[in-house]
Amino acid sequence: MPTHQCHIIRAVPVVRYVVALLHWLLWRVVVIIAISVPVFHHPFRNLRPCHFRPSWVCNRILRTSSFPMVLPSQHRALPSHQHQHYANLLPIHFTS
């Protein structure tokens, strides 16, 4: 019986390490998905892509050539009483 308890005590740091590794991998996947989701499918499509994101994410977004960008001249807020479909929002211009 004491040998089993010894194995359990030795396994606790390994379990903590595995849980921390899984948490880190899950967080990386969430970050990659958040970066790769284009603004076109995002509810805040009419805002600039850098609005809710840190600067390094913004720089990565601006470096991708096919990422949809809304020009600042078309940046306008829709009236809150109009519940329009996302497809009826502002036009998307692809920067070269």
UniProtKB/Swiss-Prot annotation:
The record's subcellular location field reads:
Membrane
| Major location (coarse) | membrane
Query: Can you supply one Gene Ontology CC term for this chain's record?
Result: membrane
**Where, by residue number, does the polypeptide cross the bilayer?**
13-35
Q: How does it sit in the membrane?
A: Single-pass membrane protein
- The source's domain of life comes to Archaea
Transmembrane helix listed as a keyword? yes
- The question of whether Membrane is a record keyword is answered with yes
Q: Which UniProt keywords apply?
A: Membrane, Transmembrane, Transmembrane helix
| Protein's name in the database | Uncharacterized protein AF_0189
Q: What is the organism of origin for this protein?
A: Archaeoglobus fulgidus (strain ATCC 49558 / DSM 4304 / JCM 9628 / NBRC 100126 / VC-16)
Taxon lineage: Archaea, Methanobacteriati, Methanobacteriota, Archaeoglobi, Archaeoglobales
